[in-house]
Amino acid sequence: MYKRQDYQLWIDSDIVFDSNKFWQLIDLATKDAEVTQEVKDKDGKIVSTQLGIDDSKVKEIVAGWYATEDGHTTSVAHWLSEEDFAKNGGVMNHETVESITKKRKPFTVDYTGFGWTLIKHGVFERLEYPWFAPKMQVFDSGNVQDMCGEDVSFCLDAKKEGMVTWCDPRIRVGHEKTRVI
């Protein structure tokens, strides 16, 4: 009998990881949603408690991070205003290896590469198809545009629908290029 999945884990073929990194993603997605539930017998007497999940508190899109091929930039970034985008040379504000390793707690990002990303069941159903399509993002003035790849476009579409993408700086995976970085 088919049982629906709770999550989809996206892994690029050049990502190096161990199973502990997977469990860290699950923990990031569900830790704030853990609740203790009472278990009652047929007479209504509490006989034990069990750990459950409050689905409304589950983080829907969570990611670890990895360095990109330059060894300096990471897979997660923050959307910039038009003015800041121009000042930054037409490049979004990616976390660097240096900046992300100083962080100690999960934080929100505007987008993440899909090399190591966990997505809760129901996210795709709330987004318009096609879910992964490069798109031209147009800034408010209409004068500046940025062609976004499919993973960036997915995250920005999810954000428009009220979903939040989380990154845990403690979940670093390897990225095998000409060397593992």
Regions found by a protein language model. Name each.
Residues 1-5:
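Conserved small/polar residues in nucleotide/adenosyl-binding loops
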Residues 8:
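Short aromatic/hydrophobic "clamp" motif used to bind/position activated sugar donors
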Residues 12-16:
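The conserved acidic donor/metal-binding loop of glycosyltransferases
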Residues 18-137:
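Conserved catalytic core of nucleotide-sugar-dependent glycosyltransferases
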Residues 108, 133, 138-175, 180-181:
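Catalytic donor-sugar/metal-binding loop of nucleotide-sugar-dependent glycosyltransferases
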